[in-house]
Amino acid sequence: MDQELIKQCTEEAQKWLSPAFDAETQAEVKAMLDAEDKTALIDAFYQNLEFGTGGLRGIMGAGTNRMNKYIVGMATQGFANYINKAFAGKKDISVVVGHDCRNNSRLFAETVADIFSANGIKAYLFESLRPTPEISFAIRQLGAQAGVNITASHNPREYNGYKAYWDDGAQVLAPHDTGIIDEVNKVSIDQVKFEPNSDLIQIIGGEMDIDYLNAVHEALVDQNVINRQKDLCIVYSPLHGTGRVIIPAALRTWGFQNINVVKEQMVVDGDFPTVVSPNPENSEAMTLGMKLGTRLNADLVLASDPDADRLAVVCRDPQGEWCILNGNQTALMLSYYIIENKKKLGQLKGNEFMVKTIVTTETIAEIAQRNNVEIRDVYTGFKWIAREIKLDEGKKKYIGGGEESFGYLPFDKVRDKDSPASICLLCEIAAWAKDNGMTLYDLLMKIYLDYGFAYQNAISVTKPGKSGADEIKQMMEDFRATPPTQLGGSPVVCVKDYKTLKQTANGEVTDIDMPTTSNVLQWFTADGTKISVRPSGTEPKIKFYVEVKGEMECAKCYPSATAEAKKKVDAIKADLGL
């Protein structure tokens, strides 16, 4: 073991034995210092938990590389310093503070509110856990200058996090993101103002819930459909998280009457005892919901992740078996329904637009373009979708947007992923499908037949440690130096490099119109395949997103079309050396 590293970590840890830290923290640090095995000490102190463009995220515990009230305190002091500078001269500066169901989330949220108040900033603190989208909504509703949400979204139970929001209700973008980071990095623990000014802390809750529920209702497209199918059998699980506060109530306000919750998962619990991981992308997390759905002969099963920004949807296939939709399919169905039915109801005025991330299915673009709705591509991360809404506020009408990672926003009153609104709208879609003699699965097949079949596959390659980071960097450099000329048996006809913002097609180089650069490459082939590659911003991984087009002549052909598409994906993986 590196003795120099042990010495460095020991010196850093000994600072945490001072009276500035509570007895529990000191005891935890002392145990690490006294242990023969220094692995825990090194993990906790070898670096500072980085405050990045999205805030903080890390394992909870004592140490500089952990989520704890002291690291949260320094982050908040830096954020408060930046807010006071950015809004210098403004009389009443305020922030909204919310949190999810995780262990220590309430403690961290109260710490955040205390520090803001101590810095002369009014803190609207939610009375208890609330969904991420409601926190985004509250920032706008209260005219606050910023917000903080304590959440680690769908990460494992050991984690917690800190998301920073700006006055538009979206996560911070340039120049504020780097400005906040600079301020946070200047702060030492002795500069943190932990003593609250209780006059500047206001608890919020029930009234904001009502306002948010009223806003979510604006995402509804056709009330008549729900009125005819109000007994649609819905099963819902919040996976022990914040969705329990809002989503059953939201479904009732939309007019649904047969709402069944997974009782074991309605219990708020940061240990997530009924799932391996509280991630709705994992089929295992849906097991209890599907069991209840089978018992009730439900039409669909839905779940939200712990902070209720993302969702999962399960519907029945022609054999009556449960079929879990992927994030692309969910976004596709929502986009299709919004456009098709707003058009039928005469709700499209010609100034509408939709937004999708560059790695999300191109079929959404096909649907939008065919129906004269503008479609925009943005980078991954919902803050970029929020940016597009803000750019055209009051000029053009945002009607929906999403990403392949199970996040969607079907209205413009919120500026982050919104599972309450998306779940309500998916139930409306299921009601509309049932009204027309279809299931959600049948509707998906109809979309494929009308707009073309496409299959998506996301591949993550893990490369841990510094050597792994170097390898990922080299892979991206190699792809840029010698891009593939063919993939899956089809020639590459277009290359997009978002690091240089240049597109090469037919030997011609043109500019890509994006607000900033990003380390992403895309290859498009003659047969309609799209491959996107980017290093993960939060994990030691390089990610490949593959979308292949295929032939599907009838709904019964879906399994064979999928099998053929998987073969093509395997060929592409081989071509890329994966």
Stretch-by-stretch model annotation:
Residues 294, 298-300, 321-323, 341-534, ...:
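Phosphate-binding and adjacent anionic-ligand microenvironments
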Residues 16, 20, 24, 40-44, ...:
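Gly/Ser/Thr-enriched, mixed-charge loops and adjacent short helices
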Residues 165-193, 328-351, 356-366, 419:
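Glycine-rich phosphate-binding loop plus the immediately following alpha-helix
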Residues 96-159, 257-313:
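N-terminal small/polar loop signature for handling phosphorylated ligands or for N-terminal nucleophile
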Residues 108-116, 159-166, 309-329, 364:
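Short Gly/Thr/Asp-enriched flexible loops that form oxyanion-binding sites at enzyme active sites
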